[in-house]
């Protein structure tokens, strides 16, 4: 046994580094907390082995140990896999410290190898596979070429250790060295080291050597609302209140739309010229475009409908960024070779607001530039004035103000536009509350365009024309309605002049007039040349009824008198005025004068018979004159000129007589057709059958009905002349019909009536006369 003891003394002493991966020694998972111990084989033969369990009394021979050592060197993986115990799941490695250096850093241990290469040794404990009854421990040294474990820590990542693998050492280690950082909107931030060296070896592992000065690089792939910590960029919405008299220069345009309420929702939008200001309606929401930084980014920052303050900002610098708070509007104006005028107003719910940001904006280029200065007022109003700076350019273009009102709900502030006749093209806007608004004055500038009102007028020849009126110094009281209506009153005067534009004198304001009504004084209009006055009260005494027809404000219809003249004014695109006479001859619509209570003179007929004097038969003065249609291929002959004119209207397709019944609006060529159509609305049946109680609306229907009675009854041929009186004919005390009732007398020829029928008619009170020779006589009240 002494020889064996001496042979065991020759075993080389090694430094054993036991790495307890499972946590037996309390070390870290990466190899921290290694225990160093120097062991030596003794003759006692009693040693502790984690794989074998207890000591053995008999020792193997040196030849057996040599054979076991050689087998371990040749197939280390096989022996390691077959004989590894349950307590060595993490493995125990021994590194040779003869050629390595160990240094301790702030976050762990670091083993630095020399340039000549390291030869780490590994000692694995297992039982002897050849000797099943023995659990002895064998310790041998083996050399693993090209590879070591390095425990390193990055200097800039807190408590994050980087485990890098060198060539030849377990290339299947998975680890994560860069933590994931996300912003509030869910986008990941990428870290890139300045001057970092990234190396990749043959086994697929990437070694990152980080440097100093880590920077955060935001992801620029998507254009979300990312607020990056970049220089020259504001981090929050800042109201611009410190630009008292600062002058901003540049050429970038910033245009916005601000709702301004003027009897509706009216927005003053910028126009392309200094000499024009257009008022157009828009929605309540305002769009604000703000310039970005050098990154050319824009960000709308206004929201909400309640406005607490109004700010006026003008900027032309492309490298500046402006923001407003969430309760204010930001309006920007630019003057780049043109004049742009913006009006802003401030308003709140029910009360008037006060301007908060007195500012002045300059940066003027060109002769048409503007200088807008916004001052703070004390009465809860915001005034902005613009003045012309630089050289006064010669402006020949007139200014025209167009107002298109819309309805506004809520306590929005109203905008009163006062254009005073001042020099220098100065406008003053004042935003006042709706509760304190009593009257609105709209005054035109001296060199501004006219306020035009187009009214339909009637010429001396009966033509309807549109007359343009130019109003100056107009004052409207209580502008509460959406439209301005010219309402005719009792003493209204209709003016007709030859000139297209007429300048009116200043109109005095009425004390109390309805909302939205402009009163036109007849005394002022009477001073104009060519005026004709129609007294509506005198029309009723003369027997003329006034009706309201759609399309024109006035229609004059004569009551059934001598000839039943009816005059209708129809505004059908400047068409002539058409009249229809029931029994008169020679009336022409071209010479009708709208005079009160006076008939128009008759005009000679222009038909071919009248021109050639062939209408009246030669030598027979008692025969009536006839009128023939001049249309080629027609040749119809009429006894009255009114009938001929109605026939000519049928040729031309003209229908001047329109039904004024509600929701009807049908038009007819002749007046009797209109009267017959009106009976369909009223249900009146004025034609009664003499033999039965049936009644009819039309006389031709009655004639057809009487023929049915004649066919049923046979007898001697007897012709009767029966005069019927309508039910609605109001007979006077003397038996004469009043002028208000239209008396229609129908001569009905009755043939082959039996004597019983004649006796029945006589008993009913109808005058029955027996005539021997019957002549066709038409004395119908409608004249046709």
UniProtKB/Swiss-Prot annotation:
Chain intervals annotated as zinc finger (C2H2-type): 627-656, 657-686, 687-714
Chain positions found as Phosphothreonine: 280, 455, 641, 652, 669, 682, 738
Modification N6-acetyllysine, positions: 704
Motif (9aaTAD): 464-472
Induction pattern: Up-regulated by traumatic brain injury and hydrogen peroxide (at protein level).
Listed Polar residues bias regions: 111-125
Cross-link annotation Glycyl lysine isopeptide (Lys-Gly) (interchain with G-Cter in SUMO), location: 16
Superkingdom of source: Eukaryota
Gene Ontology CC annotation, any one: cytoplasm
Post-translation changes: Phosphorylated on multiple serine and threonine residues. Phosphorylation is coupled to ubiquitination, sumoylation and proteolytic processing. Phosphorylation on Ser-61 enhances proteolytic cleavage. Phosphorylation on Ser-7 enhances ubiquitination and protein degradation. Hyperphosphorylation on Ser-103 in response to DNA damage has no effect on transcriptional activity. MAPK1/MAPK3-mediated phosphorylation on Thr-455 and Thr-738 enhances VEGF transcription but, represses FGF2-triggered PDGFR-alpha transcription. Also implicated in the repression of RECK by ERBB2. Acetylated. Acetylation/deacetylation events affect transcriptional activity. Deacetylation leads to an increase in the expression of the 12(s)-lipooxygenase gene through recruitment of p300 to the promoter. Deacetylated by HDAC6 which leads to increased expression of ENG and positive regulation of angiogenesis.
Entry-linked Pfam families: zf-C2H2
Family, as annotated: Belongs to the Sp1 C2H2-type zinc-finger protein family.
Name of this protein: Transcription factor Sp1
Organism listed in the record: Mus musculus
